[in-house]
Amino acid sequence: KRQVPENWVWVRLGSLYEVNPKNKADDELDAAFIPMEKISAGMLSEYSYETQKWCKAKKGHTQFADGDVAFAKISPCFENRKSMMLNNLPNSIGGGTTELIILRNASINQKYTFWLVSDERFIRGGVQTYSGTVGQQRINIDYVRSYPIPLPPLSEQQRIVERIEELFACLLYTSDAA
């Protein structure tokens, strides 16, 4: 393990987050439904959804809610960073492709979580755990649960997120100017 500042701790994703949690909601509520093709690649957290009744959106699908972070578990979507920070869903709930892994922890900065699972080390390590036939390979869920992350206090998570966003804004500005 690498050294972290004194007020940080090393934790495993599975001990910090609920992985693939379920939602309890009335079946007749409107909910989001997000198939894979409605999720953008490339660390943008851009997605769109269809509105369905909760009974249909949840049945046989991955469930998620406002505040969750979701990322693809199947190749090549995982490497392409098809991922999203879920917010402003109808009635704060949704269902979608079974090819997603969901992380939930309301006490961790959502953007910090998003950047952790977008990190090149996380992606490279996940690819090493692939199983299945070519074109249908998936990362091992145990890899996700056991992945070690440095966890700073919430104020430091926010500072890190702000710095990442500053750097991305510079990159986007530079690429737009070119």
What are these regions (language model features)?
Residues P21-E28, E79, R121:
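Proline-centered turn/helix-capping motifs that create local helix->coil transitions or kinks
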Residues G14-A25, A32-V69, L86, N91:
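Sequence-specific dsDNA recognition surfaces
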Residues K1-K24, L154-V161, A169-S175:
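Non-catalytic DNA-recognition/assembly elements of restriction-modification systems
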Residues G60-T62, D66-S118, Y130-G135, I141:
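A short beta-sheet element
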Residues Y147-P152:
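Catalytic cores of nucleotide-enabled group-transfer and carboxylate-activating enzymes in metabolic
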